[in-house]
């Protein structure tokens, strides 16, 4: 078991912003994602399984929860 196995896997809440660990793109639920036609107000946890980072095509598993400071 790796020390980093659960890194970034804390439970998220609906308004959590998520950051891509590859290109640092931030998914903000308040803004949605115009590239994937995701409407504002859509939590990261409600994105479809095929959604990927609009900048680098990374999987959702590569995203980490940002801290509470906005």
Swiss-Prot record:
Its job: Could be an electron transport intermediate in hydrogen oxidation.
MF-aspect GO terms: electron transfer activity; iron ion binding
Residues at which Fe cation binds: 20, 23, 53, 56
Cofactor note as given: Binds 1 Fe(3+) ion per subunit.
One Pfam family recorded for the sequence: Rubredoxin
Organism whose genome encodes this protein: Rhizobium leguminosarum bv. viciae
Protein's name according to its UniProt entry: Probable rubredoxin HupI
Highest rank taxon of the organism: Bacteria
Keywords, sorted A to Z: Electron transport, Iron, Metal-binding, Transport
Cofactor(s) demanded: Fe(3+)
Electron transport among keywords: yes
SUPFAM superfamilies documented for this protein: Rubredoxin-like
């Amino acid at each position: 078991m790796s020390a980093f196995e659960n890194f970034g896997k804390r439970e998220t809440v609906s308004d959590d912003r998520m950051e891509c660990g590859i290109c640092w793109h931030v998914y903000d639920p308040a803004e949605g994602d115009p590239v994937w036609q995701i409407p504002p107000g859509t939590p990261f946890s409600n994105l479809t399984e095929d959604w990927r980072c609009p900048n680098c095509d990374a999987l959702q598993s590569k995203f980490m929860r940002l801290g509470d400071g906005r």
